[in-house]
């Protein structure tokens, strides 16, 4: 493995010039044939392979390698500064043996940039320092080391810091496990699938926007971070800012996370604690996380274009009076999944209302739990334009407490335009009686036509 990536490249030959040369050679050959006697033979123009143009041509057996003129192909040792893709390189002079593996731990005390020609390995908690910005280039791969408890790896953007991680559709920024064999320039490895969970922690972003906390405190410790780590605090504290800006997350893939830090306490794929509406979050993918896919603890940030696949608990989770909008999401559950939505309301006197809209939820035919949604703890907000398919018979949308049912009756919890494929009756139910262990003892099906959308 190299200690650094050498960026020198051979300049590729201009394709237009090559075409002119070939046409000229053909024209000269034709003239010679017409003017010579039958005993003369036309000259043969020898065309040399272009070994650094990213095209398989002129005898090359692979792109820019093989044949009589280019370097050996994949069985050869990578040569990382010759302008040719060879050996185990995943691009020209990058990836494989040519990639620098940079291990990162502790606090980032200066503005930092991570680039796509390296692989970054999170060793434990990596925290963006207060007042500092972590910039991650499109196509960059970040891998988390295995570990649990205080050793669980995670990237934490604490209050007062920023992350600028803006990928593209062609070059997403990928957070994954160190076990993943994905390399520089690639978008997927070959050795892990969506059922590989808990291989590392996750991505945590914290801010100072509104949150509703028990006893009306103004800041609390985020789920997934031990209580003695002060960088895990979120909430306004003494500086409420609903427009708080924690940066940008766009075209991000988070895979194989959810490391355990305590009994029943795992890190979510993407955790957002009191994140403000000045932050941009869109095109986020979470695959194979032990706990929730994306969880919103308070805050005002909007999020759009979300995909959660094969989560071990809930796909989209709302808590502590989150009051932003989640728009255009897709949830694909598997046999380990619980709810597509788990929605909790305020814990203190501050209230807030969420909007969750334009979402498709795909259930699992084999999940032991696998419910549509659970609305709990005084939940308030609107869930609309939902398309649900693939859930087992008997699964439902739960109004899981009397205060939630009352919010529905009072118009503070609303449901609009749900289309549920496969059921002609309502899937919405109120849990009206529980035992001491919080198990459901009695359920009432709600058939009010204003409650549920068209079924088919």
What are these regions (language model features)?
Residues 60, 89, 254-257:
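Surface-exposed interaction patches
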Residues 24-25, 29-54, 62, 70-81, ...:
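Bacterial Sec-dependent N-terminal signal peptides
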Residues 1-34:
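Sec-dependent bacterial lipoprotein signal peptides
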Residues 103-130, 134, 145-160, 168, ...:
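Extracellular beta-rich repeat passengers
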Residues 54, 58, 83, 87, ...:
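Register-specific beta-strand positions within repetitive beta-rich fiber domains
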């Amino acid at each position: 493995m190299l200690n650094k990536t050498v960026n020198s490249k051979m300049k590729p030959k201009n394709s237009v010039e090559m075409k002119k040369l070939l046409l000229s050679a053909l024209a000269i050959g034709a003239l010679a044939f017409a003017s010579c006697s039958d005993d003369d033979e036309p000259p043969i123009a020898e065309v040399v392979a272009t070994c650094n143009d990213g095209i398989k041509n002129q005898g090359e057996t692979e792109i820019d390698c093989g044949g009589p003129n280019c370097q050996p192909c994949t069985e050869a040792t990578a040569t990382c500064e010759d302008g040719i893709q060879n050996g185990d390189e995943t691009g020209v002079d990058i990836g494989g043996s040519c990639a620098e593996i940079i291990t990162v731990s502790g606090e980032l005390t200066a503005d930092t940039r991570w680039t796509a020609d390296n692989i970054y390995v999170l060793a434990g908690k990596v925290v963006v320092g207060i007042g500092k910005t972590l910039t991650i280039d499109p196509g960059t791969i970040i891998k988390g080391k295995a570990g649990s408890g205080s050793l669980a790896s995670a990237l934490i953007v604490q209050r007062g810091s920023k992350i600028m991680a803006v990928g593209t559709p062609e070059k997403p920024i990928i957070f994954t496990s160190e076990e993943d064999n994905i390399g520089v320039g690639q978008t997927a490895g070959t050795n892990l699938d969506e059922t590989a969970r808990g291989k590392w922690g996750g991505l945590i972003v914290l801010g100072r926007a509104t949150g509703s906390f028990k006893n009306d405190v103004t800041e609390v410790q985020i789920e997934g971070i031990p209580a003695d780590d002060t960088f895990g605090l979120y909430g306004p504290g003494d500086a409420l800012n609903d427009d708080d800006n924690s940066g940008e997350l766009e075209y991000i893939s988070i895979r194989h996370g959810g490391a355990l830090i305590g009994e029943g306490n795992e890190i979510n794929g993407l955790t957002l604690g009191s994140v403000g509406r000045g932050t941009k979050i869109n095109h986020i993918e979470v695959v194979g996380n032990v706990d929730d896919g994306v969880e919103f603890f308070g805050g005002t940030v909007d999020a759009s274009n979300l995909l959660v696949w094969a989560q071990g608990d809930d796909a989209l989770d709302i808590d502590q009076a989150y009051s932003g909008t989640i728009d255009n999401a897709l949830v694909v559950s598997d046999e380990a999944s619980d709810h597509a939505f788990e929605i909790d309301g305020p814990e203190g006197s501050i209230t807030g209302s969420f909007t969750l809209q334009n979402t498709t939820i795909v259930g699992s035919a084999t999940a032991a739990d696998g419910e549509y949604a659970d609305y709990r703890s005084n939940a308030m907000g609107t869930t609309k334009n939902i398309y649900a398919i693939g859930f087992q018979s008997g699964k439902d949308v739960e109004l899981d407490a009397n205060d939630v049912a009352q919010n529905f009756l009072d118009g503070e919890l609303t449901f609009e335009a749900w289309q549920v494929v496969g059921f002609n009756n309502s899937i919405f139910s109120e849990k009206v009686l529980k035992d001491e262990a919080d198990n459901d003892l009695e359920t009432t099906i709600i058939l009010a036509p204003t409650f549920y959308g068209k079924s088919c």
